[in-house]
Amino acid sequence: MVDALRVIRDDGSTDPRLDPKFSEDQAVAMYRGMSLQRILDNRMLALQRQGRIGFYGPSLGQEAAIVGAAMAMAPEDWIVPQYREPGAALVRGMPLKELLCQLMGNAEDPVKGHQMPCHYVYRKGNYLSISSPVGTQLPHAVGIGWAMKLRGEKKAVLVFFGDGATSTGDFHAAMNFAGVFKTPTVFLCNNNQWAISVPVSKQTASGTLAEKANAYGFDGIRVDGMDALAVYRATRDAARNAREGLGPTLVEAVTYRMGPHSSSDDPSRYRDEAEVAMWQARDPLPRFRKYLEHAGWWDEGREARLEQEIGDEITRAVQEAERIPPPAIETIFADVYAEMPPHLRQEMDAFLGLPRR
């Protein structure tokens, strides 16, 4: 990979100049977060095919960029996701059951079924909900950072987006505002090579996405997005600079969307299997596992136990979430106004008075 920050070498050793020097507990926690995201994705795609959830957007291949970036942020920082970052919410403490309730839109869904599946929110973890249109979260993240700066808070905001979002007007507006007002924003672009069926080569004429930051007056850095330690290092440094008042940073994590865009997509219709195989050889999970093994922290026994543990956790969460009924029908009208106005109450009363099947 050309001109991209890399920490983990092919043999599992690390570049001593860039290694964040994790303890065993830190390294294992990062690997667990990545493994949880991978196993969850595979299980949720299977549930969708069985008709037990309506929609799912997997993150296969992007676990290092998601978990590595999220773990680099302080607990008081904010995370503004797109639709592929449940791993970021989970490493912040979101219970699996709560995530499953959102996917199923049941009575314990934090947003009462008002959102699409995969549009998670975790308030305790400062993890914002999202809107489906690509790129709309970028101005929101910059606004949160601007508010932090006005309040004199030493915090930072991490916002995730993909290569396709760099073609939107909201990307320009957010980057320009962040650069002019030096907001404490870390822009994490998951360049996974494909925006549904559009390759990154058709998104931009620039050599890299990271260099776009130059036009807005701040730094951009390109990292190997299949290397969790590289993403962690770049995000940690960017967040530190943001808290110190040095302004935003654009981090381009060069990664690959190994699976479909969503459960409604068939990537075999538009991309070459040889390309997929090339990127699968760089899979971030075996790579991080090799790092753990090189450090003497991992073996096949621990791997088997971890997979079993995560699988059991997901099974329990699914079973618990499926026992919960759907939301009460009147919640359709909830959370629109702080106090329901007369016209909406009238509509609700009329709706609830309709005969039910």
Question: Locations of the language-model features?
Answer:
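Cofactor-binding active-site loop characterized by glycine-rich and histidine/acidic residues
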Residues: 39-42, 46-183, 199-205, 210, ...
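Short secondary-structure boundary/hinge segments and terminal tails
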Residues: 65, 90, 196, 231, ...
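Glycine-rich ThDP/TPP pyrophosphate-binding loop and its adjacent helix/strand module
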Residues: 126-323
